């Protein structure tokens, strides 16, 4: 399959951001078309996001394994390998199964600094039905990089990914 990713998405205004997330969701559908393998889909999703969304220094998955998260496909610097559900922004997302939007990670109790350049973070749960299979973690060197529109846009993209993927039992 040949696929070209759009240039960096425009996040400069609320309207541009909404249009950019609609494009991202369409690109996710195109990239995943005909492929249901979970490793391939997580890898492609991470690459697509990292390549097209501005001001990120890490984008990827942590896989749910018991009461901890284990690093999965990602783009960015070498990452923390294991994160207990009891620690950090990713752990809070895994525990609550709710989106975690953190404007300043240094003010977050129990934050795990895998990359000291990260200043804000957005983490979304990835569910297969009711089962937590992973979290999708986005880090930025900018403080307050993410907002509610980012959370909404990524939640829609994650829903497309989750529904188009065959997850291991």
Question: Which residue ranges define each predicted feature?
Answer:
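Regulatory sensory and allosteric helical modules in signal-transduction proteins
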Residues: 56, 64-114
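Short hydrophobic/aromatic beta-strand element in the GNAT-like acyltransferase core
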Residues: 58, 123, 135
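A short, aliphatic-rich beta-strand micro-motif
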Residues: 120-127
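A generic structural motif
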Residues: 142-144
């Amino acid at each position: 399959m040949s696929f070209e990713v759009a240039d960096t998405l425009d996040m400069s205004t609320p309207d541009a951001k909404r249009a950019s997330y609609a494009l991202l969701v369409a690109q996710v559908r195109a990239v995943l078309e005909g492929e249901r393998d979970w490793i391939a889909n997580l890898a492609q999703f991470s690459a697509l996001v990292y390549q097209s969304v501005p001001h990120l220094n890490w984008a990827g998955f942590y896989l749910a394994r018991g009461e901890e998260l284990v690093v999965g496909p990602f783009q960015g610097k070498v990452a923390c390998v294991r994160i207990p559900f009891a620690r950090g922004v990713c752990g809070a997302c895994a525990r609550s199964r709710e989106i975690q939007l953190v404007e300043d990670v240094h003010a977050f109790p129990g934050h795990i600094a895998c990359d000291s350049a990260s200043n804000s973070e957005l983490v979304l749960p990835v569910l297969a039905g009711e089962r937590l299979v992973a979290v999708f973690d986005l880090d930025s060197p900018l403080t307050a990089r993410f907002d509610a529109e980012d959370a909404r846009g990524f939640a829609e993209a994650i829903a497309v990914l989750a529904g188009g993927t065959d997850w291991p039992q």
